[in-house]
């Protein structure tokens, strides 16, 4: 009799509830997904390592073209399993004007099923609706056009534009 290896890890899919998290950010704040979702949708862009080529290209895309996302009612984060200190240096070097989240325990990466080989995150981007449900998972991220692709996908998913009456964080979209 042959026995198969059973994996108890559940790969997240569109329609699943996004796992909550509470992670330290490069802007000095901690972000809890459930708190941010009270205000608007969330884009969580996992990246393998701060300072590596593809990750630098992706971060620069978001830093240089983030204006494409500012009018859409969504908060976006990059996230990795790097220590916060590494992500802070990485954010400063790339002029990131958005939060980079650190998951040094790797628990959130495991919850999102992005932990590869047990030590780095896969480059996957999760689009999460205000109701906490995963709307889309991009498992083929193009670092060079990350900002443009995010903006297009958010619009395609029907995420509304920001309005003064509905945006509670218009002056600083990343303050909590």
Residue ranges with predicted function:
Residues 1-20, 169-175:
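N-proximal helix/coil linker or "cap" segments that precede and/or mark the start of modular domains
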Residues 8-34, 155:
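N-terminal "domain-start" segment that seeds a small globular fold
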Residues 33-62:
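Short active-site neighborhood of thiol/selenol oxidoreductases, capturing the structured segment around
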Residues 56-94, 106-110, 173-176:
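Structural microenvironment flanking redox-active thiols in thiol-disulfide oxidoreductases
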Residues 96-98, 114-126:
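Structural micro-motif
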Residues 99-103:
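Short acidic-hydrophobic, aromatic-tinged amphipathic segments that line or gate anion-handling sites
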Residues 121-176:
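Thiol-/selenol-based redox modules, centered on thioredoxin-like
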């Amino acid at each position: 009799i042959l026995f198969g290896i059973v994996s108890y890890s559940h790969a997240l899919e569109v329609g699943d509830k996004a796992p909550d998290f509470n992670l330290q950010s490069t802007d000095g704040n901690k972000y809890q997904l459930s708190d941010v979702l009270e205000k608007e949708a969330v884009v969580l862009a996992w990246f393998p390592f701060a300072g590596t080529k593809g990750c630098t290209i992706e971060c620069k895309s978001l830093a240089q073209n983030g204006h494409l996302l500012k009018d859409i009612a969504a908060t976006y984060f990059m996230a990795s399993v790097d220590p916060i200190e590494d992500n802070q240096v990485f954010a400063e070097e790339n002029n990131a004007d958005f939060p980079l989240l650190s998951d040094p325990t790797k628990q959130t990466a495991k919850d999102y099923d992005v932990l590869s080989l047990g030590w780095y995150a896969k480059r996957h981007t999760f689009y999460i609706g205000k109701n906490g449900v995963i709307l889309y998972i991009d498992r083929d991220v193009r670092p060079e056009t990350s900002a443009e692709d995010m903006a297009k996908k958010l619009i395609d998913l029907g995420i509304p534009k920001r309005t003064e009456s509905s945006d509670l964080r218009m002056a600083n979209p990343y303050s909590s």
